[in-house]
Amino acid sequence: MLYWIGMMLENSWGPMRLLTSHFFLGGLGFVACGYLTWRFLPRFAEKYCPRDRGRAHAVEANKAQGKPTGAGIVFIPMFIAVQLLVLPLSWEALGIIALTLVASVFGFLDDKSSDAWGEYIKGAIDLVIALAATVLIGGFDSVEIWLPFTKHQLMLSPLLYIPLGVVWIWTAINATNCTDGVDGLSGTLASMAFLTLGALLYFVLGHVEMSSYLLVPHYNDGATYGIMALSMAGTLAGYLWHNAHPSSLMMGDAGSRAMGFLLGVLVLKCGNPFLSLVVAGVLLVNGGTGLLKVALLRFFKIAIFRDIRFPLHDHVRKNKNWSTPQVLVRFSLVQMAMTLGLLVLLLKFR
């Protein structure tokens, strides 16, 4: 909305041009989302969110019992309200915003249910949401992607792009959800991912000269999705103020599923599947490897990582005696190293 107001009034009053700046709108989205979440989340979570019932087999699950959970149903609508103000809206962006809310609502219904929903029900819902998002992004046309170590691009037919996109978004949703078991962990790792994606989408993929210099594609809507990424990073900053150890509330499935969904979508919008490792490698290893272990054992009777407990944060807490702050700091340091190292390789070795 603000973008279009700026477009209409910039000739009448020069300072209104500021509202047409994606950089300004990204900063405004970050600050507004962060402030609203920091200011109002505890009040609404205490009043409207259910109490955590603990996770079966999770390490130190008893410490979370009784705290407000499902806080995502509070901060995701705040995030969406800000997006309606700061984004140069398109039908695609509106669709992504709507699906983010859908993911949050279904997660919240599971959070507040007296009996946890079955894995297959939640998996099927995630699959439908992932399919809708992939079709919304790529349509039924061939999609061009770019790969590491080559300046050439690859065309994927919809018969290949749609299944791969669905699998990626579904994995992002569930890996992020599995990581939400340590105070501040999923929020910190995800906020790092969104900041990196925001920088890539705005400064590189959404910038004509920079994308040409680095021999990567230029996307006209890259800066728009950069605003979205920075706004979610701000939202998570406000949430982490209250989720820092020892936490006073938790995002629950209402937050982690919506957050994972948006993370998956933004990686697709970047056009390079390997960015998933760059921005969210620790999230994928921590939560996604456990999904792989369970799937192989359940459907193919193949056992892997027999001596490792998943999610990996439970393994290091129980078997390595890491404290919660140690898990958070060490996982974050590994992700920082992965992001900086792999990003240089991805962008410069072409």
Show which residues each predicted segment covers.
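Cytosolic, membrane-interface loops and tails of multi-pass inner-membrane proteins
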Residues: 39-65, 291-322
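Alpha-helix N-cap/helix-start motif at coil-to-helix transitions, marked by capping-box chemistry
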Residues: 231, 286, 306-310
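Solvent-exposed interhelical
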Residues: 181-195, 305-313, 317-328
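Hydrophobic alpha-helix feature that most strongly marks membrane-spanning transmembrane helices
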Residues: 242-246, 259, 267, 271, ...
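"…together with the soluble PPM/PP2C metallo-phosphatase catalytic core" -> "…together
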Residues: 2-285
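Final/C-terminal transmembrane alpha-helix of multipass membrane proteins
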Residues: 325-346
